[in-house]
Structure formats: structure tokens, C-alpha cells
Amino acid sequence: MSSPGIDGDPKPPCLPRNGLVKLPGQPNGLGAASITKGTPAAKNRPCQPPPPPTLPPPSLATPLSRVALAGGPCPPASGPASGPVSGPPVERPPLATDEKILNGLFWYFSACEKCILAQVCKAWRRVLYQPKFWAGLTPVLHAKELYNVLPGGEKEFVNLQGFAARGFEGFCLVGVSDLDICEFIDNYSLSKKGVKAMSLKRSTITDAGLEVMLEQMQGVVRLELSGCNDFTEAGLWSSLSARITSLSVSDCINVADDAIAAISQLLPNLAELSLQAYHVTDTALAYFTARQGHSTHTLRLLSCWEITNHGVVNVVHSLPNLTSLSLSGCSKVTDDGVELVAENLRKLRSLDLSWCPRITDMALEYVACDLHRLEELVLDRCVRITDTGLSYLSTMSSLRSLYLRWCCQVQDFGLKHLLAMRNLRLLSLAGCPLLTTTGLSGLVQLQELEELELTNCPGATPELFKYFSQHLPRCLVIE
């Protein structure tokens, strides 16, 4: 894991995205564990963290020393004395170490800034290492960051006690092997019961490694496998546990129809399934049964090129309680498939039809007529959608988020239909080439709009953005 330079200047802060954040390393003064499985960590060794930069507040003539920052006595100010000083030095009130104040203050900093602030002093670290400041964040650890190289060239596993103190319940491991995963399990004290979510990306985990991981880490209920090409469908059959409620598999070349059979039979409590596999066919979707029908509420079939309307039939009959469905990139699905969805999945709140080139305005008529609870609709790259389709959507009072990125046939007349959608909070028109400045300016009538995306829109001029800033002051306009 990366850490600030020895000169004290931190690297540029990294921003959380989708719950994932790259955390800098923590010089917490603790020894590192041996690479040998099961070997206890070395005894704690005192380690002095690098001194933080001392920046004087505007109201102070001289910068505070580290002692003062930690609540100790302030040194006298330099310069000519104004008079004789009698008695002991006045002690600064320990505001900088008041835990009540710090507990409120630290909420205003990003995750990466908190990592740096935790190095200021023990009092700050004690406050910052409370799990509440790290809830919802997932540390990302690359394989090379899991080991320290000793002077003799040997490697030892890094100390993960700082992560345990902050109570992280999920990890994303990138480029790891079976051995790396075993070392992680042996050296992270919360791995057996405390870790709820594991994500493995671009890793060489095998069937055996997957089985050991899920057998040892009994707390894992959310699993993501992305770009892992060394495990097979047999590995899923031998390792999947009924406790898993969320599973995501993408870019894993050995995943095909039999993987869905394993998922449907072994995961009766599955609530969320995300699958991106080029070789999955309609046959796989027939494996879903009533067992998943009661529990599964989210299904994402991403770029499953072989799935047709026949596969959609299997989905709508087996999973009637879906509230979120994505058919993004399922290029063989047509308007008839969307009609099946609209007629049978009346509980849907989110529907993603992006990158479905066969979808036309007729599909939007089905959506508008039957999906009265729908709050989010994604139509990115649906190149056959026209202004007529938008006229159907304008009747949907429940819709709050509408994505029309790169819908190249949408024109100003279609935007006029959207002006009737008073509950709309998010609208994306990125890449729509036929929209003019005049047509876009009418969007100021949507006073409840919170986010408007206009990237790569020829009609989005600097004058238009200025106009929006004046008439849509509460809306984030993405240029």
C-alpha cells in the first residue's frame, strides 16, 4: 500500500468511487507478520511517524509546535518581549486532543485525508481509528503491497492490525494468488468471522484457492470475482455456500451455463446476482427456480450476447419479485423481450436497457404503460430511440432518473416532452448530437432537477452553463 513520502507531503488524495478507496499505508509502529502461514506477528517495535507539516493558522503569529498541537504547553512567541513575564507558562487548553471536538471535526475529511491525519499523534489516531469513520469503504490491496522486502531479499507479510482496528468488513485484492489469499487469512485477525465482503480482481485464484477462502472466511456473504481466469465451474460447485447473498462474476472465461446451474442450486438466499459472461445462453436462465424467486431482487445480465427473448421469458417467470433488472449489452433482446418484462415484473424500480441496439420507441410504450413504480431507466446507446419514445416516458410520474447518453436521434422536440416530468431529479443527455442551445435552455423548467449531464453535447455552450447556474442554482450541471 502506498504511503506519504518521507518529506511529509502526501500524495494527491484519492476519491472514493462506488465504495472503493485506495488507502495509503499506515506507519502504526507495529511489526510485520512472517510470510510463513500461521507464524505469529513479530513483537511491536516503536516507530516514530514523520512529523506533520506545521502550518500556522491565520490568527497566529507563529506556528504551533507539535507539543502544543497535542495539548501540551505552548512555547513563548519569539520577538521582543512586551514586558516581564512572571509565573509558569500558560498552558494551552487541550482543544486539539478533545475527543468530542475531534469526533465532529474528522467527519469533514476524505478517507485519504483521514489516513494522513492519523499520523499526527496518538490521540488523533485513537479517534480516527473508530470504525464509524470507515464504514462503507473497501480497502484495495494489490499483491505487491501485501509484502515487505527485507534487507536479505526475503519477504514478510505486512501487518494488517491497523485495518483490524478500523473494523473493515470488506476487502478488494488485486492480482493475488492462492498463497496470497492464505497469507491474508492467517494475518488478518478479523478474516474468519469479521469480513463480510471479498472482491478478487485480475487474480490467479484456482478452484482449490476459492474453496479454501470460502471455507475459512465464514463471514463472507458478498463475493465478487472479476478477471479471474484460473477457476472453473467445478470450483463454484465445490465452494459456493448457502450463506452468500450477493454474487458478482465478470470477465471470467471459464464461466458459462453450468455456472448458473451451480448458483441456482447452491445459493437459495441469493438476493443480488451480477453476471457478465459472453458464453451464457438462454439455457442457463432456465436453471432459476422458485427458490430464487422469493429472495432475488436484483439481476444484472451484462453483455450476455447470446441471451435472447427466450431467456427473458425464463427470467420473468422464475424471478417475479425483481426490483432491479439490467439487460445492458444483451444485443439480441428486442421490443418483445421488453414487453415481457413490463407485463410480468411490475415491482421493478430500476431498468437498464443500455447498449440494446434493437430497442425502439415501442419498447418505451410498454415500459410507460405497465411499470408504474419505475424510478430509474437507462437507455444509453439505444440508437433507435426517437422523440416519440420520449413522449411515452413523459407520462411516468414515478421516474426520477433518466439516462439518454448517445441517443443520437433525440432532438429538441423530444426535450419538450420531458418538461412534464416534474419529479425528475437526474437527467443525462451526454453525447446527444442533435440538441441545440435553445432546446436545452428549456430544461430550466425542471426546477427539482439535481443533476444534469451535458458532456459532449454540441449545443451545450459556456453561455448555456452560465444560464443554468442562474436559473438552476441547486442543480449540478456536468459539462
Curated annotation (Swiss-Prot):
Q: Is Transmembrane helix found in the keyword set?
A: no
- Every copy of the F-box domain together lies at 94-139
Pro residues: compositionally biased ranges = 47-60
Q: Which residues carry this modification: Omega-N-methylarginine?
A: R92
Repeat keyword on record: yes
Spans of the LRR repeats? 321-342, 347-369, 373-394, 398-419, 423-444, 446-470
- Keywords per UniProt: Leucine-rich repeat, Methylation, Repeat, Ubl conjugation pathway
What InterPro entries does the record tag this protein with? F-box-like_dom_sf, F-box_LRR-repeat, Leu-rich_rpt, Leu-rich_rpt_Cys-con_subtyp, LRR_dom_sf
Give a Pfam family name: LRR_6
User: Which SMART domains does the record cross-reference, listed alphabetically?
Assistant: LRR_CC
Record region (Disordered): 1-92
**For this UniProt entry, what's an example GO CC term?**
cytoplasm
Q: Which Gene3D superfamilies match?
A: Ribonuclease Inhibitor
How this chain assembles, per its entry, is: Interacts with SKP1 and CUL1.
What this chain does, per the entry, is described as: Substrate-recognition component of the SCF (SKP1-CUL1-F-box protein)-type E3 ubiquitin ligase complex.
In its UniProt entry, what is this protein called? F-box/LRR-repeat protein 16
Q: Which organism is it from?
A: Mus musculus (Mouse)
Give the gene that encodes this protein.
Fbxl16
